[in-house]
Regions:
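A short helix-breaking turn/cap at a secondary-structure junction
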Residues: 175-257, 280, 344, 424, ...
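Short helix-loop capping/hinge segments that flank enzyme active sites or metal/cofactor-binding pockets
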Residues: 55-77, 237, 292-340, 347, ...
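Glycine-rich, small-residue loops and helix-cap segments
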Residues: 14, 57, 96, 147-150, ...
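Acyltransferase
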Residues: 11, 41-44, 254-276, 301-308, ...
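Gly/Ser-rich catalytic/binding loops embedded in alpha/beta enzyme cores
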Residues: 1-158, 264-265, 269, 462-464
Length: 574
């Protein structure tokens, strides 16, 4: 429930904090205090009138390559700036649910870079270590979150811009599957691989924002909907891919120890580590900037090079975009074919695991180091991030403690549409509880009462395709439970009416394709049908034909399958 005046109070606190930290390089455009307070009052009035505003009391910073109505979009190039006709769908959806935009944030010019230092508005410094880079290109949005200026930072990610800054600021960065969040109203970098992302201090907050932004939008040809087989969560004991030691050679000794520590903690929580060959991933990542795909950057903003004087562009950005101008079409075709082969090899590596665990970046350089070698440092920073979008993966970057006095971060990645899986494993790292089941793809509710319960022999038929446990439930007091003959041991639930009892079970959300496979594989006497719960809800569940139960052992007095199994183990013999 939203507290009275939440939006107004949060806006006032945000502007106090902005004045306190005095970091003007974070912003390109900061809205006026009175204007934003007036908007907050309107949001509070809507909330008081009963409007559904889950983001009431949330303040938002938007990277300045994403359109916001009434504010100029510059992409950190003043000559390029324009006033958009309206907000990007991603922004509009957040505002509609109660979020308030404070302003537009600084970035590496045209979202070209991973350092946060390629901007005429100044290099954005790390929140906690001002001598070090913030990470880019979504520098301002990340630092705004890390400094507590805003609750959410809207960003973009082509090669790691929504993840590298998260690692350097000790915050969370979610990069959804490409196309789930509309990119309409976003200045393109490499349109085929661009993605709208979000920064927050927790996985829950970031995932809730992504859920609000997700969904096709008119005029956005790259939009994608959740497929029917999208997994709804990670299994209880996930298989986690980790790279061979050689692929981590660029890490310092202390960072390597920190990464190994994260992996060890996951094992202690029940995960299994599986070594994967990272070479096809790294090779795919190199294609993004060393290959012909960089031509997309020239297609997006190359006209700026021709129209404006050299001094209007950052030298590194200009060099990257200009080099893409003369790439021949046959090279793009060849690289597209090579990427397809590399994608096949990479996905084969992921076939045996639920997620891939990697350091987010190999180092955290100083501003001086970047100034001395801007292109070399930038390329190294993308070692573990540039392949994500070209291979069509989902990713969540999370903080993983402090090393050598600064934040260390890791990223959980998985194939497209496994967004809930990577978020669940990310929560294991941060220590957050299982997330809100409203985020992500929709699942079909299913009640299980026997061998499909958590930890029971047939539970894999739910967990393997990505079903998500909602929690324990009980049936209405109109069922009886019978122990059926055969292996594995399993019960049958029969509705009998007034002579019944309330039986314990679990409610799961199941991907539609997984439920169809369950139904196709069912054998008599079991079936799926409507089952009434003790709270009055009617939910699909496992039922049994009454005729088959007539010759089976009635175990209803135990109140559930697990209680019956426990009684069998404790019943004295002889």
């Amino acid at each position: 429930m939203t507290r009275t005046g939440a939006a107004t109070a949060r806006v006032q606190a945000a502007y106090r904090r902005i004045a306190e930290v005095d970091r003007p390089e974070v912003w390109i455009t900061l809205r006026g205090h009175d204007e934003v307070l007036a908007e907050a009052a309107l949001v509070d009035a809507r909330a008081a009138a009963g409007a559904d505003l889950p983001l009431c009391g949330t303040v938002l910073a938007v990277k300045d390559n994403i359109d916001v109505a009434g504010l100029p979009t510059t992409a950190a190039c003043p000559s390029f700036g324009y006033l958009p006709e309206g907000s990007a769908p991603a922004v509009a959806r957040l505002v509609e649910r109660g979020a308030i935009v404070l302003g537009k944030t600084n970035l590496d010019q045209f979202a070209t870079g991973l350092t946060g230092s390629r901007s005429p508005y100044g290099a954005v410094r790390c929140a906690a270590h001002p001598d070090r880079i913030s990470g880019g290109s979504s520098s301002g949005s990340a630092v705004a979150v890390a400094l507590g200026l805003v609750d959410l930072g809207l960003a973009t990610d082509t090669a790691g811009s929504g993840r590298v800054p998260a690692a350097f600021q000790g915050i969370v960065g979610i990069k959804p599957t490409i196309g789930l969040v509309p990119t309409a109203g976003v200045v393109p970098a490499c349109r085929s691989f661009d993605c709208v992302t979000v920064f927050a201090t927790t996985v829950d907050a970031a995932e809730a924002a992504v859920a609000v932004m997700t969904g096709p939008a008119p005029g956005d040809p790259s939009g994608r909907a959740w497929p029917a087989d999208a997994p709804l969560g990670a299994p209880g004991k996930p298989r986690i891919g980790v790279p061979a030691p050689a692929a981590l050679a660029e890490l310092s000794v202390s960072w390597r120890a920190a990464f190994d520590g994260v992996a060890a903690r996951l094992v202690a929580l029940g995960a299994e580590l599986v070594q994967v060959d990272l070479e096809p991933f790294l090779a795919a990542g190199r294609l993004l900037y060393r290959g012909a795909f960089v031509a997309e950057r020239y297609a997006a903003v190359g006209a700026v090079l021709e129209r404006y004087p050299r001094e209007h562009l950052d030298p590194s950005v200009r060099a990257i975009i200009a080099a893409a101008r003369d790439i021949p079409a046959h090279r793009l075709v060849a690289d597209t074919e090579r990427l397809a082969r590399l994608r096949g090899r990479a996905l084969a590596q992921l076939a045996g695991v639920d997620v891939l665990l990697l350091p987010t970046a190999p180092e955290h350089p100083t501003l001086a180091a970047v100034a001395a070698d801007p292109l070399g440092v930038n390329e190294r920073l993308g070692t573990y991030t540039t392949f994500t979008n070209v291979l069509d993966l989902a990713a969540v970057a999370v903080p993983a403690g402090e090393v050598d006095g600064g934040p260390f971060g890791v990223t959980v990645q998985a194939r497209a549409f496994a967004d809930r899986v990577v978020a669940d494993v990310a929560r294991l790292i941060t220590g957050e509880p299982t997330g809100n089941t409203d985020a992500g793809p929709a699942g079909l509710p299913l009640v299980v009462v026997g061998a499909h319960l958590s930890g029971e022999p047939l539970n894999g038929e739910l967990s393997r395709p990505g079903a998500r446990l909602v929690g324990p439930v009980r049936t209405a007091a109109e069922y009886r439970l019978f122990a059926l003959p055969g292996t594995p041991a399993r019960p049958g639930l029969v509705r009998v009416g007034a002579d019944g009892r309330s039986i314990a079970g679990e409610l799961w959300l199941v991907p539609p394709t997984a439920l169809a496979e369950l139904l196709a594989g069912l054998r008599a006497p079991l079936s799926l049908g409507p089952l009434r719960l003790d709270d009055g809800r009617s939910v699909t569940g496992f039922l049994c034909q009454p005729l088959a139960a007539s010759a089976a052992l009635d175990i209803s007095e135990h109140g559930g399958w697990r209680a019956y199994l426990t009684s069998c183990q404790t019943t004295p013999t002889g």
